[in-house]
């Protein structure tokens, strides 16, 4: 599946502020709150989780 312009924007946002990318992809659900927790505990795990969510869905 090719990347769209919105996917590229979400990836850039996920690198800068990971919860925003997850929120745009999945909304305000469990994935969003998991990503907030991961970002607080460590910035890199938050980025990895955000990229996983964006690339999976």
UniProtKB/Swiss-Prot annotation:
It is a multi-pass membrane protein. It is found in: Cell membrane. Its main location: membrane. It holds the Pfam family Pmp3. The chain crosses the membrane at residues 3-23, 34-54. GO terms for cellular component: plasma membrane. Keywords: Cell membrane, Membrane, Transmembrane, Transmembrane helix. Belongs to the UPF0057 (PMP3) family. PANTHER family: HYDROPHOBIC PROTEIN RCI2 LOW TEMPERATURE AND SALT RESPONSIVE PROTEIN LTI6 -RELATED, UPF0057 MEMBRANE PROTEIN ZK632.10-RELATED. Plays a role in the regulation of membrane potential. Could mediate a proton leak. This is Plasma membrane proteolipid 3. The lineage of its organism: Eukaryota, Fungi, Dikarya, Ascomycota, Pezizomycotina.
């Amino acid at each position: 599946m090719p990347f769209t312009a919105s996917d590229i924007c979400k990836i850039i946002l996920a690198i800068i502020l990971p919860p925003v990318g997850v929120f745009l992809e999945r909304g305000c659900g469990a994935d969003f709150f998991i990503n907030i927790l991961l970002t607080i505990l460590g910035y890199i795990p938050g980025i990895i989780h955000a990229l996983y969510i964006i690339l999976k869905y």
